Amino acid sequence: MLTKAPRGTKDILPSESYKWQYIEGLIREICDVYGFKEIRTPGFEHTELFLRGVGESTDIVRKEMYTFTDKGGRSITLKAEGTSPAVRAFIEHNLYAETQPTKLYYITPVYRYERPQSGRLREHHQFGVEIFGAKNASADAEVISVAMTLLKKLGLNNLELRINSVGCPVCRKNYNKVLKDFLKDNLEYLCDDCKVRYEINPLRVLDCKVESCQRITKDAPLITDYLCDDCKSHFEELQKYLDIMGYDYIIDPRIVRGLDYYTKTAFEIISKDIGAQGTVCGGGRYDGLIEECGGPSMPGVGFGMGLERLLLTLEQNGIEIPKPEGIDLFIAYVGEEAKLFTFALANKLRFNGLKVERDNMDRSLKAQMKYANKLNAKFAIVIGEEEMKENKVKLKNMRDGSEVEISIDEIEQRIKNI
């Protein structure tokens, strides 16, 4: 067991990590141009945060959280999702007292005890954005635009944006009554989870993936028919913003998301080429969450995107992440004096920004050059006693085999100019 990672976790090796670095770099670029600032929250929180924030009727709270009692007797839970910790930090550090809105993003590991499957692990990584303090539907459209921009820049074009409004506490109260009346005659046929949802948050029965529950709910009354004037106006406004950006979308009354805190907007982005595993992003508005977690009454909207699922989607669509270029220079050496000299030279060139490698295995010159090829070096030099004495080396272009004699002092500038 010491040499095997726990079930539901995965090592990201150098052969894969470049893909993560590429996506994370693109995320940071996009968030920067949209004005989002990075936030980093702890890997664990007080359990109450998720109970109040995520909702006690959710699968996350009821089945999936990693919760333990620490040595101080406190109930602690590993980060199960990114929004609630961001809200907690927003409140704790009085960010609500600053000029609003507050626009945050994060890339973070999250932990859920669920059955490991393709694109879904017990430790996975989530990219999310949050806008706190903006009630206008333009904020909803903006977070959707961030997600769509990322996916399109990665080459995913066959996307389907599905939107819904789940209302507010006022209109949802009326709808919940209508929905419960509709469901009560078939209550015995609902799955065990939905029987619990029926009592606590009946709206979430619509989110169930169990076939028997879907058959029952396919003719359920639509929440969009029960929206109050404010929620209806907000939903119509969102559609205007999506229209002006040129985004196609489908109004799907079944989109309610798996967390209890959503109000008004709920959305999902689906890669149509994948099918059941095709949801790559989901989010929405949560106007009561900040107050529920102990802060002032302020609105919020955001999304979460699983990076493992995103990478799987790219792979299944045949989209390859660009591999990093090879190193700039490999320095081979012959002799003990050159061994020390090239160590110092490599260190100097690295300090000045060149990607440089040299041999640390005491290989023969032939083996060193073979190693340079394996590292995909752009250039190579060989330094021995004569090169040190003359202060000159032959700079070899490893792509075409051409060589040019230059002074050792010229190496850095010559490579940077090519």
From Swiss-Prot:
Keywords: Aminoacyl-tRNA synthetase, ATP-binding, Cytoplasm, Ligase, Nucleotide-binding, Protein biosynthesis
Chemical reaction(s) catalysed: tRNA(His) + L-histidine + ATP = L-histidyl-tRNA(His) + AMP + diphosphate + H(+)
Keyword Ligase among UniProt keywords: yes
Top-level EC class as recorded in UniProt: ligase
A cellular component annotation (GO) from this entry: cytoplasm
PROSITE patterns: AA_TRNA_LIGASE_II
Localization, UniProt: Cytoplasm
InterPro entries with a match to the protein in the record: aa-tRNA-synth_II, aa-tRNA-synth_II/BPL/LPL, Anticodon-bd, Anticodon-bd_dom_sf, His-tRNA-ligase, HisRS-like_core, HisRS/HisZ, HisRS_anticodon
Record carries keyword Ligase: yes
CDD domains given in the database record: HisRS-like_core (cd00773), HisRS_anticodon (cd00859)
Subunit structure: Homodimer.
Family that this chain belongs to: Belongs to the class-II aminoacyl-tRNA synthetase family.
Name used for this protein in its record: Histidine--tRNA ligase
Gene transcribed to yield this protein: hisS
